[in-house]
Swiss-Prot record:
Protein name, per record: DNA mismatch repair protein MutL
Its job: This protein is involved in the repair of mismatches in DNA. It is required for dam-dependent methyl-directed DNA mismatch repair. May act as a 'molecular matchmaker', a protein that promotes the formation of a stable complex between two or more DNA-binding proteins in an ATP-dependent manner without itself being part of a final effector complex.
Family: Belongs to the DNA mismatch repair MutL/HexB family.
GO CC, alphabetical: mismatch repair complex
Keywords: DNA damage, DNA repair
InterPro entries the record matches: DNA_mismatch_repair_CS, DNA_mismatch_repair_MutL, DNA_mismatch_S5_2-like, HATPase_C_sf, MutL/Mlh/PMS, MutL/Mlh/Pms-like, MutL_C, MutL_C_dimsub
Disulphides: none
Gene responsible for this protein: mutL
BP-aspect Gene Ontology terms: mismatch repair
Gene3D superfamilies assigned: 3.30.230.10, Histidine kinase-like ATPase, C-terminal domain, MutL, C-terminal domain, dimerisation subdomain, MutL, C-terminal domain, regulatory subdomain
The organism of origin for this protein: Escherichia coli O139:H28 (strain E24377A / ETEC)
Residue ranges, annotated region (Disordered): 363-397
Amino acid sequence: MPIQVLPPQLANQIAAGEVVERPASVVKELVENSLDAGATRIDIDIERGGAKLIRIRDNGCGIKKDELALALARHATSKIASLDDLEAIISLGFRGEALASISSVSRLTLTSRTAEQQEAWQAYAEGRDMNVTVKPAAHPVGTTLEVLDLFYNTPARRKFLRTEKTEFNHIDEIIRRIALARFDVTINLSHNGKIVRQYRAVPEGGQKERRLGAICGTAFLEQALAIEWQHGDLTLRGWVADPNHTTPALAEIQYCYVNGRMMRDRLINHAIRQACEDKLGADQQPAFVLYLEIDPHQVDVNVHPAKHEVRFHQSRLVHDFIYQGVLSVLQQQLETPLPLDDEPQPAPRSIPENRVAAGRNHFAEPAAREPVAPRYTPAPASGSRPAAPWPNAQPGYQKQQGEVYRQLLQTPAPMQKPKAPEPQEPALAANSQSFGRVLTIVHSDCALLERDGNISLLSLPVAERWLRQAQLTPGEAPVCAQPLLIPLRLKVSAEEKSALEKAQSALAELGIDFQSDAQHVTIRAVPLPLRQQNLQILIPELIGYLAKQSVFEPGNIAQWIARNLMSEHAQWSMAQAITLLADVERLCPQLVKTPPGGLLQSVDLHPAIKALKDE
């Protein structure tokens, strides 16, 4: 067979073998493109695990009409232009292969509009030569990509797709990782027309632990130790779980990011494992969410087809830096607070050297004793060091250069050009509000909040009651019923049986399913908030309440149930309060604007401050 140039579609399908492994790979590439475009909101719609439809819609800068055809061509990108750019990459994408590869194994449609254009344009590629057709369309500022029938023309690849549930779980995990990398972006994920995940953007200076708790769970949040460690141009931030309380479930939480890019790096994992090895068993793994910031010149991201790995120019330096950062926080957690007396304090001690890794350790100089590292709330430089010259750094690198690179992907300020509200925006407009930052827990069941410089107290049991009521109140569809493993059979009177039969349709909307006979009623299913309740007490009380009613409204019944549910928390922790408020703000946004009585009480500190100043 003679040497010949492959047709464009065949060449793209070969490239797709590396880029498009499964539907989750498509979602990752397209969402990263949205982030590179400066999007602050991304909506992801999935059907049948991504095999039928993947739709990514963002409010980024958009693509000009003249560049739409280029966007679907191979090796066409706006991220880099020269070899110098390739050596200092800060964007998530840079190869220009994703859209061309995806369009070769699916029916891809690209619709986009920039702020300068009066109308949007739509592009799609088809045929053996992948010719691009562009036509006008209706679309707000931003971009929408639709990927239909993935692998429709490559049956062998489609045959290797797993079940719908498995493929969607992979997509869900990718979105979790991206949501942990970009707290400033709102991300909504739906599957088969149903909203599955809603990650609201965290405002600058806001409490990132809310999204952390929503993704990693309350158990991780309760054991999380905040890290903020710096040396020269290396910065390590994030959270590591207390190794003394790490469980197998927590050990699955291992998220690492390098300059905002999600990674699976053995060097970083090894450094963290070494720092925790004295407190972990042989079969245990550490749990962490860590963000490493490094000069883009000192890391090569173009070493893996799917960009899952990186290569550090100074790998030993990075390893020891991470090791000392994690070890310092773990050691501070074990230290007791300093006594407030005049007794002489012990001399500062040196942090133990990393003897396992070869080479000189640049971070083991003596360090002064510092306060205990806080849980879940980042503190100013809990284990930081003064900026020092970067050992063995490449000559000629300037710190200002790194700042310029970091600023290239900053989201444009919203004041530069106001955008017209999109049709779907009003539904989430109320979610832009927040109760504020949780400062501490007072009297075991009240949260002390700070918002815009104002202090307030919030009753956690009342907030929990409103959340339960929102979870029980049916919307457009009835509340999902959870079948009971062992149905509950109760004896009822004729009056109670009559009331139950009249309220049957209302109870069905609330997710309560029952069957009655002559003198008994059998409860077969209840909604999720009732699963952990003592149903042998709650259900008879509910039946007694219904027997006294003449009108059976689902909303009134949901309100009664919410008021009579037993709280799962006798004493609230910070992590539980943060998780609760995140759920309340998502499901009950109206409570933020107009808090009902008994929920929120402002605290006036001015008299106390005035009294202190007058002393």
